[in-house]
Curated annotation (Swiss-Prot):
GO cellular component terms, semicolon-separated: cytosolic large ribosomal subunit
Classification via PROSITE patterns: RIBOSOMAL_L1
Role according to the record: Binds directly to 23S rRNA. The L1 stalk is quite mobile in the ribosome, and is involved in E site tRNA release. Protein L1 is also a translational repressor protein, it controls the translation of the L11 operon by binding to its mRNA.
PANTHER family per the UniProt record, alphabetical: 54S RIBOSOMAL PROTEIN L1, MITOCHONDRIAL, LARGE RIBOSOMAL SUBUNIT PROTEIN UL1M
Description of how the protein assembles with itself and partners: Part of the 50S ribosomal subunit.
Protein's name in the database: Large ribosomal subunit protein uL1
Gene3D superfamilies: 3.30.190.20, 3.40.50.790
Family according to the record: Belongs to the universal ribosomal protein uL1 family.
Amino acid sequence: MTKLTKRMRNIREKVEVTKDYEINEAIALLKELATANFNESVDVAVNLGIDARKSDQNVRGATVLPHGTGRNVRVAVFTQGANAEAAKEAGADLVGMEDLAELVKKGEMNFDVVVASPDAMRVVGQLGTILGPRGLMPNPKVGTVTPNVAQAVKNAKAGQVRYRNDKNGIIHTTIGKVDFDGAQLKENLESLLVALKKAKPTSAKGVFLKKVSISTTMGAGVSLDQSTLETTTK
C-alpha cells in the first residue's frame, strides 16, 4: 500500500470532498494547504454543459483577467513594417517574419505566446507542425491572429488566459498565484466565468456551468458553491 505524504494526509484531513465550498473559504483553505517551496499557481476546472463531440458546442476563446496571472509572459510576433514597430513598443519580446520562423525551426522557442498579423500567416502556416502541438499556433478565435498586434501583445502581457474545452467538456486554466490576495483570486475567477457564460454556444441546453473547482499546483482541489460567486453577465 502506498504511503501517504504528510502533505496528502493534511489535505485528506482538511478537505471535504463532497462539500461545495463558499469561495472565500475555499481560497483560504487552498492557501493554508499550499506548502510547496515555490509560488504555486491557482488553477480552475470548469465542467461545461456541452456535448464536446459536437463541433458547434465546443468553447474556445480568451479573456484578460483583471489582476493578471502572476506569470511573466514572453510574446513572439510575426509581422512586418509599421506593425513590427508597434509590437516592439507594446513590449513584444521577439518580432520578425522569415528570420523568426528560422529560429522556430531550429527549436529556439523562448516564448509563451505567438501573435501574428494576417499577412504573416503565409510564414506562420509553415510552422504548424512545430507550434500546433505546443499550443502556440496563432488563432483568430483567441485574438492572436489580428491586424492590431500591439493590442494582442498588451493583452498577453496583462494576463490574458486562453481557454478551450477538452474532450470531456472541461475547461482548464489558471487564475493567478497563491500569493495573490483572496479578493484578487475571486475577481479573476468571476471574470473568467463571466467570459465563459458569454461564450455559451446557442446549441448548448440546460445548465452551462455545471461544476467549478479550484486547486493549486501541488495541493488540494475543492469544489465551489457557485451561489457565492458574482457571475451575472451584462
